[in-house]
């Protein structure tokens, strides 16, 4: 019986040892689990932080990309406008010469020499007008048209029953447009 008691004691001791080992392993596991949980929380926090930075950076990149596209579009439009209106400065400088040609051609020729001179001036005038037309310059229609402050500059007002109200009665100086841009408005007399 003593043997049996010793055997039971031995078994109990072994069970206690196993329980202690199991308890030690469990406490180590729970310490590791706590450490793993806190490490997981730190990692999740880091992931969230990096995700926020990524979102912010993506947003900034998209805004920069949109700004760059807008910039390219503006540069292209400016380039097209510069090409379209490249002759504006030259045309503005030539307009006074055209006005002088028109005035000179209104003079009555008294002899053959004068007629020949006027004929030569008229040829030069037509060539200038042709060259300007090729560049997209056109005279602004004024007399009989409704007054348009974008195309006409009113220098006088009159009352004339032959014309509608606010119609251009007389043109003092021709106006010109380059494509769709007014270079010089027509100086006109307007009916009230």
Curated annotation (Swiss-Prot):
InterPro entries: GrpE, GrpE_coiled_coil, GrpE_head. Keywords: Chaperone, Cytoplasm, Stress response. The keyword Cytoplasm applies. GO terms for molecular function: adenyl-nucleotide exchange factor activity; protein homodimerization activity; protein-folding chaperone binding; unfolded protein binding. Residues 25-34 have a biased composition (Acidic residues). It comes from the Bacteria. Residues 1-20 have a biased composition (Basic and acidic residues). Pfam families: GrpE (PF01025). The keyword Chaperone applies. Its main location: cytoplasm. One of its GO terms (cellular component) is cytoplasm. It is found in: Cytoplasm. GO terms for biological process: protein folding. Residues 1-34 are annotated as: Disordered. Belongs to the GrpE family. Participates actively in the response to hyperosmotic and heat shock by preventing the aggregation of stress-denatured proteins, in association with DnaK and GrpE. It is the nucleotide exchange factor for DnaK and may function as a thermosensor. Unfolded proteins bind initially to DnaJ; upon interaction with the DnaJ-bound protein, DnaK hydrolyzes its bound ATP, resulting in the formation of a stable complex. GrpE releases ADP from DnaK; ATP binding to DnaK triggers the release of the substrate protein, thus completing the reaction cycle. Homodimer. This is Protein GrpE. It comes from Bacillus cereus (strain AH187).
């Amino acid at each position: 019986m003593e043997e049996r008691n010793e055997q039971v004691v031995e078994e109990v001791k072994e069970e206690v040892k196993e329980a202690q080992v199991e308890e030690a392993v469990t406490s180590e596991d729970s310490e590791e689990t706590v450490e793993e949980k806190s490490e997981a929380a730190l990692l999740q926090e880091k992931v969230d932080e990096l995700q926020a930075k990524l979102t912010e950076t993506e947003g900034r990149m998209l805004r920069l990309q949109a700004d760059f596209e807008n910039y390219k579009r503006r540069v292209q439009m400016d380039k097209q406008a510069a090409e379209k209106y490249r002759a504006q400065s030259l045309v503005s400088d030539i307009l006074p010469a055209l006005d002088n040609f028109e005035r000179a051609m209104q003079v009555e020729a008294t002899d053959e020499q004068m007629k020949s001179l006027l004929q030569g001036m008229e040829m030069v005038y037509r060539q200038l007008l042709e060259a300007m037309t090729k560049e997209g310059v056109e005279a602004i229609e004024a007399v009989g048209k409704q007054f348009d402050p974008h195309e006409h500059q009113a220098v006088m007002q009159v009352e004339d029953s032959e014309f509608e109200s606010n119609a251009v009665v007389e043109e003092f100086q021709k106006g010109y447009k380059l494509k769709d841009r007014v270079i010089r408005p027509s100086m006109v007399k307007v009916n009230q």
